[in-house]
């Protein structure tokens, strides 16, 4: 079995910054709280909560409140600053830029965002601009619009959405901006290319991770594909495949990917009788 590990794996810079900051605050002995997953990864969150991070939607006290990488609505941020002695905003810089862009364009035209309405990033965005968030093309009366995208969306799916919207409507002015994170785009392209040469693609990442789901869908077009959160989820028949490719979402730590590769090698060794 040949194991091919993608070059673009592990944390993106926004996730890495968020986790590093939370760990530093906890190491300082501060009571750190937040209202949801810092990142969409089960193992990472278990590690942080064991170190002392408190996660609850109804938190009202603590020394430090940390804003997740996905961001939160503007009004909520101001409210938290009145409640907590210290608020650390760990919103990904690329996500913050999306919020600012939506806010700016909302002054002159309708903002349409390609994304999942219930995703934390999109919930936060609506706190900055009165945007329509959807992945389904629709008819619209407004004549001046701007198209934006959730930062973890598929670029190709976003383009298809915009083209369909323009065909369905009679816009006088339509601005199209690529607000997708370049890190996720690079991973998307690598998965598109590598999965074509694989008999089996393994996508490692949290079940709630939007960008991991995107990579799974892309790989599934070209090869047998499985989505796992841990090495324990690897199926016994994985050893029957000649070429296995390993990909990861941006909230998946390198250590988890290394454990998956180690498990694959152990399974192959047992099949061959070498261990």
Curated annotation (Swiss-Prot):
Pathway noted in the entry: Isoprenoid biosynthesis; dimethylallyl diphosphate biosynthesis; dimethylallyl diphosphate from (2E)-4-hydroxy-3-methylbutenyl diphosphate: step 1/1; Isoprenoid biosynthesis; isopentenyl diphosphate biosynthesis via DXP pathway; isopentenyl diphosphate from 1-deoxy-D-xylulose 5-phosphate: step 6/6
Keyword Membrane: no
Catalytic residues of the enzyme: 121
Cofactor binding note: Binds 1 [4Fe-4S] cluster per subunit.
Keyword check for Transmembrane helix: no
Residues engaged in binding [4Fe-4S] cluster: 12, 92, 181
Keywords noted in UniProt: 4Fe-4S, Iron, Iron-sulfur, Isoprene biosynthesis, Metal-binding, Oxidoreductase
Cofactors that this protein relies on: [4Fe-4S] cluster
Alphabetical list of Gene3D superfamilies matching this protein: 3.40.50.11270, 4-hydroxy-3-methylbut-2-enyl diphosphate reductase, catalytic domain
Residues that, per the record, bind (2E)-4-hydroxy-3-methylbut-2-enyl diphosphate: 40, 70, 119, 151, 209-211, 251
Listed Pfam families: LYTB (PF02401)
GO biological process, one term: isopentenyl diphosphate biosynthetic process, methylerythritol 4-phosphate pathway
Class in the EC hierarchy, top level: oxidoreductase
InterPro entries: LytB/IspH (IPR003451)
Positions annotated to bind isopentenyl diphosphate: 40, 70, 119, 209-211, 251
Enzyme Commission designation: 1.17.7.4
Its biological purpose: Catalyzes the conversion of 1-hydroxy-2-methyl-2-(E)-butenyl 4-diphosphate (HMBPP) into a mixture of isopentenyl diphosphate (IPP) and dimethylallyl diphosphate (DMAPP). Acts in the terminal step of the DOXP/MEP pathway for isoprenoid precursor biosynthesis.
Similarity-based family: Belongs to the IspH family.
Protein name: 4-hydroxy-3-methylbut-2-enyl diphosphate reductase
Lineage, opening ranks: Bacteria, Thermotogati, Thermotogota, Thermotogae, Thermotogales
């Amino acid at each position: 079995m040949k194991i091919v590990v993608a070059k673009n794996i592990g944390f993106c810079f926004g996730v890495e910054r968020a986790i590093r900051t939370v760990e530093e605050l906890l190491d300082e002995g501060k009571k750190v709280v937040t209202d949801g997953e810092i990142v969409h990864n089960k193992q990472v969150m278990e590690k942080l909560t064991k170190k002392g991070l408190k996660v609850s939607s109804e938190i009202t006290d603590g020394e430090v409140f940390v804003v997740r990488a996905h961001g939160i609505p503007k009004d909520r941020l101001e409210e938290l600053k009145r409640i907590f002695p210290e608020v650390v905003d760990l919103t990904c810089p690329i996500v913050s830029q999306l919020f600012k862009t939506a806010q700016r364009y909302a002054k002159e035209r309708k903002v349409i965002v390609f994304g999942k309405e219930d995703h934390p990033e999109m919930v936060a965005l609506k706190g900055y601009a009165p945007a329509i968030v959807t992945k389904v093309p629709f008819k619209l009366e407004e004549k001046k619009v701007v198209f934006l995208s959730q930062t973890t969306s598929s670029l190709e799916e976003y383009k298809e959405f915009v083209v369909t919207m323009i065909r369905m409507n009679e816009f006088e002015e339509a601005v199209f901006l690529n607000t997708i994170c370049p890190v996720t785009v690079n991973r998307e392209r690598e998965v598109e290319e590598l999965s074509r040469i694989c008999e089996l693609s393994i996508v490692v990442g949290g079940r709630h991770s939007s960008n991991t789901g995107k990579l799974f869908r892309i790989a599934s077009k070209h090869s047998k594909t499985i989505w796992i959160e841990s090495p324990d989820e690897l199926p016994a028949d994985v050893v029957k495949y000649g070429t296995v490719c390993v990909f990861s979402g941006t909230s998946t730590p390198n250590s988890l990917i290394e454990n998956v590769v180690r498990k694959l090698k152990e399974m192959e060794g047992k099949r061959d009788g070498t261990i």
